[in-house]
Curated annotation (Swiss-Prot):
Keywords: ATP-binding, Chaperone, Cytoplasm, Nucleotide-binding, Stress response. SMART domains: AAA (SM00382), ClpB_D2-small (SM01086). GO terms for cellular component: HslUV protease complex. This is ATP-dependent protease ATPase subunit HslU. The gene is hslU. Belongs to the ClpX chaperone family. HslU subfamily. The lineage of its organism: Bacteria, Pseudomonadati, Pseudomonadota, Alphaproteobacteria, Hyphomicrobiales. InterPro entries: AAA+_ATPase (IPR003593), ATP-dep_Clp_protease_ClpX (IPR050052), ATPase_AAA_core (IPR003959), Clp_ATPase_C (IPR019489), HslU (IPR004491), P-loop_NTPase (IPR027417).
Length: 433
């Protein structure tokens, strides 16, 4: 779990996301509160529940991007899911408890990766012995093995092909158990039922270099205590887990609609106990959800937050509104983030030996076109910039391999030549931009 202060979290998010200070502050405080709770003792720690967040804002303003960046910062089990993928329990499709099962799998992978590093040195030695067995045979003498070991460490044998036995992947047949709700639970792997079948292995031919990582990971896993690893992962989910529920506005039931709504109101009802706190059964054990932080987000351009079930609204107490992007925001998005669009295109063209040079007026023109099309066609926020950039650089991208060593100057006139008329013609821009 990260111990960044809210100010540090916000400044980290600022490196990649323009504006939306309120949303950044809300998630930064929520993340810091996770750390604060863990510093408390005994019963008080159990009483402090996370303050779940509802982010409201038009499409393309940074809601999902905030979640992506937060996942990397959190250092905690983090899962992003779309609310539209779930159906009410008892119907075909995934039920919401699958969210927690997936979160446990994420946590197990995280803990395993961390623990592998602790046994890395011993695993390297064991993996080296397995490579030597494949090269010179298990019964070879010490002198031969030492000679090959020196060559192996010097990298002289990297391209040599060897045959090794590796653990068979999770390719066990899957089948449905009738009557079990939700396709994801119903599909059970034979490997899960009968264990690992005595550790099935398969032979593979690989180069020495390619086999290294596979063998090191296998040897590291042999040194790990799986039961302890799973317990740690479940504890991490229960205390630090974060779930980002995207597109929550799409499961609102709007006035005048009637019918079963198994993937709308039914899903909202199923989410209630999950967010409030319940115990979910997974194949690794029971998981309590009281202290998992839920961050929900939606555009709410047709439905309103008040269209959510009142009980669900109450379980998302912190509301954050994200603003639509202005022309100035568009301009900043093109230039300021560490991996801004312009930096990406310059780097891509550099691989062809072509230099792209954007003038300031070109950046203004790109922002103007994006804002103009957003206002006349459909406002899709910053995503419009990608469409405009692709259109502007279409010709350069196509001819770049034949123009090695050349410099292309992109200015306002170049932008207008390529997209200016399209932006003005609303009927055309509906289909092209």
């Amino acid at each position: 779990m990260t111990d960044f202060s809210p100010r540090e979290i916000v400044s980290e998010l600022d490196r990649f996301i323009v504006g939306q200070a309120d949303a950044k502050r809300a998630v930064a405080i929520a993340l810091r509160n996770r750390w604060r709770r863990l510093q408390l003792e005994g019963s008080l720690r159990e009483e402090v529940l996370p303050k779940n967040i509802l982010m409201i804002g038009p499409t393309g303003v940074g809601k999902t991007e905030i979640a992506r960046r937060l996942a990397k910062l959190a250092g905690a089990p983090f899962l992003k899911v779309e609310a539209t993928k779930f159906t009410e329990v008892g119907y075909v499709g995934r039920d919401v408890e699958q969210i927690i099962r997936d979160l446990v799998e994420v946590a197990i992978a995280q803990v395993r990766e961390k623990k592998r590093k602790d046994v890395q040195a011993r695993a390297q030695v064991a993996a080296e012995e397995r490579v030597l067995d494949a090269l010179v045979g298990p019964g070879s003498g010490p002198a031969t093995r030492d000679s090959f070991r020196k060559k192996l460490r010097a990298g002289e044998l990297n391209d040599k092909e060897i045959e090794i036995e590796t653990q068979a992947g999770s390719g066990s047949p899957m089948f449905e158990i009738p009557g079990m709700p939700g396709a994801q639970i119903g599909a059970v792997s034979l490997g899960d039922i009968f264990g690992k079948m005595g550790g099935r292995t398969k032979k593979r031919r690989l180069t020495v270099a390619d086999s290294h990582e596979i063998l090191v990971n296998e040897e590291a896993d042999k040194l790990l205590d799986t039961d302890q690893l799973v317990q740690e992962a479940i504890a991490a989910v229960e205390n630090n887990g974060i779930v980002f529920l995207d597109e929550i506005d799409k499961i609102c039931v709007r006035d005048g609609r009637s019918g079963g709504e198994v993937s709308r109101e039914g899903v909202q009802r199923d989410l209630l106990p999950l967010i409030e706190g319940t115990t979910v059964s997974t194949k690794h054990g029971a998981v309590k959800t009281e202290h998992i932080l839920f961050i929900a987000s939606g555009a709410f351009h047709i439905a309103k937050p008040s269209d959510l079930l009142p009980e669900l609204q109450g379980r998302l107490p912190i509301r954050v509104e994200l603003n639509a992007l202005s022309r100035d925001d568009m301009r900043r998005i093109l230039t300021e983030p560490e991996a801004s669009l312009i930096k990406q295109y310059v780097a891509l063209m550099k691989t062809e030996g072509v230099t792209l040079d954007f003038s300031d007026d070109a950046i203004d023109a790109l922002a103007d076109v994006a804002v103009a099309v957003n206002s006349t066609v459909e406002n899709i926020g910053a995503r419009r910039l990608q469409t405009v950039m692709e259109r502007v650089l279409d010709e350069i991208s196509f001819v770049a391999p034949d123009r090695h060593g050349e410099t292309f100057q992109v200015d306002a006139d170049y932008v207008k030549t390529n997209v200016g008329d399209l932006a003005k013609n609303t009927d055309l821009s509906r289909f092209i931009l």
